[in-house]
């Protein structure tokens, strides 16, 4: 595992406990076959040659268990992309490069995946952890979000306990709300609302934002509008600083 130890004796014990619980959750993720046809667990692609000791490759890039902010995406992609990139998040992904600009706007200076060492500063994960079998743009099934939400997404958020959970896109937002059985609002209203949703008992505040991939940037929400959306996250994050 790449998670650094820090702090005094009590802090070391708490960190060790977090690491142990996280690794146990990762092992359950690797063994999961709940969704069946349409999804493939990274642990079986090329006999697990490109899988990682994290909830997924996005968490391998940013997997700090004490992160103040967690980003939840929809899914990582499909089997073909995973094999082509040998299981690594790419430096050239429009989603990744734009996300780093948005995070920089609220004070987080992160590096691209191949330039990142250690477990990073934040925690990234996806609402669906397995890989699509029929192409990156293929449809996703509601039960995939339900299965992953209760088995992995909620336990991961409760383990990390970030101050803020940023939901990247409507499906990620609905997955988080569904994992807590909280009624989701209309997405635009949720994005533009001055109020966040509090997740009990961990106390994380949920902020949905539009996806920052090329298609959404070019059609639904341009970069300038997304920067404005992220400003409210920055204000909340730095209250009391």
Question: Where do the language-model regions lie?
Answer:
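Basic, amphipathic alpha-helical patches used to engage nucleic acids or provide basic targeting signals
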Residues: 193
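Intrinsically disordered, glycine-rich low-complexity segments
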Residues: 7-10
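A polyanion-binding, active-site-adjacent surface
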Residues: 16-188, 196-217, 222-239
